[in-house]
């Protein structure tokens, strides 16, 4: 039976520290504030937005939601971004992805002020990570993976890590982050041949495919540490990850659950970044 790596325990510890820091900011009449930009009305985006707002309210972090039409002109979006960048009361800016196809992703990401880029979307902030500098904002999901491993005293040094994702949201930045911790990294993707033969040799497997219960027990060895980043809906309408949790947990060394795993830490780190930004700009 695997050790279950609960993310909500990690999140709770981070929030305890945030409460103290937010109280100190209040003494200076500073209230941390996040601007959320959502284009369109996709149910997943609305649900995510509500969860962020709820989490912010619990810590007395203010939010400002900009609900935008999916067909918004790029120039109008950039004008709004410029306004938010210049608004002193706004400490962090989060733009929901993916963007409508008519918008240039690089231009949108580059329009976010570097000091308000709380999910590390700006190319210059990402470049810093690729250069091995982990001192500023990091993408929240990859950072959540690192924080959970750190909380449970799982040392990355010398470990063989397989990441099943090659996106700029998870796979690529995470690969650079674990490299900075002296791990050896393999990135796999949809074109990888014989994926189980690769993952089975790994010490740590991180999966972010987005396919419910696709990853079965034959992908792992008895000592595997499994980090399931995805949040999917299974055949019964329940939340699940990429990994067939109930079967795999009997065969590996440790595993994150879904829910109460990586996702809970991801949102908490977003809150931490907002507070970080408020402190830096105070």
UniProtKB/Swiss-Prot annotation:
Transmembrane spans: none
Pathway the protein contributes to: One-carbon metabolism; tetrahydrofolate interconversion
Role: Catalyzes the oxidation of 5,10-methylenetetrahydrofolate to 5,10-methenyltetrahydrofolate and then the hydrolysis of 5,10-methenyltetrahydrofolate to 10-formyltetrahydrofolate.
Binding positions (NADP(+)): 165-167, 190, 231
Source species: Clostridium botulinum (strain Hall / ATCC 3502 / NCTC 13319 / Type A)
SUPFAM superfamilies in the cross-refs: Aminoacid dehydrogenase-like, N-terminal domain, NAD(P)-binding Rossmann-fold domains
Keywords assigned by UniProt, alphabetized: Amino-acid biosynthesis, Histidine biosynthesis, Hydrolase, Methionine biosynthesis, Multifunctional enzyme, NADP, One-carbon metabolism, Oxidoreductase, Purine biosynthesis
Descriptive protein name: Bifunctional protein FolD
Keyword Oxidoreductase: yes
Subunit architecture: Homodimer.
Signal peptide (from-to): none
GO biological process, any: methionine biosynthetic process
Matches recorded under InterPro entries: Aminoacid_DH-like_N_sf (IPR046346), NAD(P)-bd_dom_sf (IPR036291), THF_DH/CycHdrlase (IPR000672), THF_DH/CycHdrlase_cat_dom (IPR020630), THF_DH/CycHdrlase_NAD-bd_dom (IPR020631)
Enzyme Commission code: 1.5.1.5, 3.5.4.9
One Pfam family here: THF_DHG_CYH
């Amino acid at each position: 039976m695997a050790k279950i790596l609960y993310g909500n325990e990690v999140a709770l510890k981070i929030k305890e520290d945030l409460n103290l820091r937010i109280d100190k900011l209040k003494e200076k009449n500073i209230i941390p504030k996040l601007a959320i930009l959502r284009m369109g009305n996709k149910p997943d985006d609305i649900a995510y937005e509500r969860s962020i707002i709820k989490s912010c309210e619990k810590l007395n972090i203010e939010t400002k939601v900009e609900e935008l039409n999916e067909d918004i002109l790029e120039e109008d979006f950039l004008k709004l971004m410029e306004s938010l960048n210049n608004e002193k009361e706004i400490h962090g800016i989060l733009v929901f992805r993916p963007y409508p196809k008519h918008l240039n992703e690089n231009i949108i990401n580059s329009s976010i002020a570097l000091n308000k880029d709380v999910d590390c979307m700006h190319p210059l902030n990402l470049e810093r990570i690729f250069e091995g500098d982990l001192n500023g904002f990091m993408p929240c999901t990859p950072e959540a993976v690192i924080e959970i491993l750190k909380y449970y005293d799982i040392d990355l040094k010398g470990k063989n890590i397989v990441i099943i994702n090659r996106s700029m949201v998870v796979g690529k930045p995470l690969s650079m982050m674990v490299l900075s911790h002296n791990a050896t990294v393999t990135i796999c993707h949809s074109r990888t041949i014989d994926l189980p033969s690769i993952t089975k040799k790994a010490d740590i497997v991180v999966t972010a495919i987005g396919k419910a219960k696709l990853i079965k027990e034959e992908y792992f060895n008895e000592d595997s540490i499994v980090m399931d980043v995805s949040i999917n809906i299974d055949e019964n309408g329940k939340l699940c990850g990429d990994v067939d949790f109930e079967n795999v947990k009997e065969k590996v060394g440790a595993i994150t659950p879904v829910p109460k795993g990586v996702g809970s830490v991801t949102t908490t780190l977003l809150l931490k970044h907002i507070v970080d930004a408020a402190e830096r700009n105070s």
